[in-house]
Regions:
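Conserved glycine-rich Rossmann-like NAD(P)H-binding loop of the short-chain dehydrogenase/reductase
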Residues: 24-41
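Rossmann-fold cofactor-recognition segment
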Residues: 48-62
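Conserved mid-core segment of classical short-chain dehydrogenase/reductases
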Residues: 90-106, 149-152
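A short helix-coil junction within the Rossmann-fold of NAD(P)-dependent oxidoreductases
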Residues: 24, 76-77, 94, 122-131
Length: 161
């Protein structure tokens, strides 16, 4: 059994990965912005035996929430051996962006790149202690082939490759 931190698991690929890991018998600690978003979902903690899933508030733009998430996971599960990074944002900022788009570009880079780097760095000692640590980062083909209006998104995904 693995114990896995999964970011961005309230919908989409992250939700499906979290569900798959639970079905395979693993314990998961999910980090999401909206704690209520899992009610009624396939990973609603009320649908699983106690001790299989914990829900943590995680805002990729606030490093303290990553620190708290890791601490809560270690306190509850005794540690973890995997981190799966699924959180991210899609922003439509073209390569020839307009003045004023810099904030959107920085937000995209902070969430899609720096937050993942921070979470992995904060997790590193725990992953090493487990003796079988794994880091999985979801990227996108857009990181290799940029479309005109996805320059910020593509740059943030390329930075992860």
């Amino acid at each position: 059994m693995r114990t896995i931190l999964i970011s961005g698991s309230s919908r989409g690929i992250g939700l499906n990965i979290a569900h798959k890991e639970l079905k395979e018998g693993n314990r998961i600690s999910v980090g999401i912005r909206n704690l209520e978003s899992l009610k009624g979902s396939v990973i609603d903690p009320n649908k699983w035996p106690e001790g299989r899933i914990i829900i943590n508030h995680y805002d990729a733009l606030r490093k303290i929430t990553a620190e708290n998430w890791i601490k809560n996971t270690v306190d509850e599960f005794g540690g973890f051996d995997s981190v799966i990074n699924c959180s991210g944002v899609l922003s439509k900022v073209p390569f020839l962006y307009k003045d004023g788009d810099e904030e959107d570009i920085l937000n995209t880079l902070n969430i899609n790149f720096l937050a993942i780097w921070h979470l992995c760095r904060l997790s590193w000692d725990h992953l090493c202690t487990s003796g079988r640590g794994r880091i999985i980062v979801l990227v996108s083909m857009s990181g290799k082939r940029s479309k005109g209006d996805l320059a910020a998104y593509s740059s943030s995904k390329f930075a992860l490759m």
